[in-house]
Amino acid sequence: MTATKPLVILKETILAGESKTINMEIAKLHTMNKLKIPIIVERSKLDGPTVLFTACLHGDEINGTEIVRQLIVQKINKPKRGTIICIPIINIFGFINKTREFPDGRDLNRVFPGSKTGSLASRFA
């Protein structure tokens, strides 16, 4: 069975059999440099499940980042069926600052499912 429905993430369309890196802009630093998080999407031509690998939900817990990186480098993230999405660093703020929390002092793991009008961490969730 072939995959027929395109996948849309952040207004980017990923077709069956396609690979794409989407850079999600999440903020601007005081230097006006854009802060982006890469989302690596690999799709098979065949239908199947969608699997998401993430790491660094807490910015000071970085071991998972290397695991996700190895999945990508070794091409383990190329699915035979379905879609694999990799996000090596979720909490880029905490990662840069070597801290668990977002700049607003909140633990991202405690604000799911989030809110469009909430704190920075809540909006991100």
Short names for language-model regions:
Residues 1-125:
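Structured catalytic-domain cores with a bias toward divalent-metal coordination
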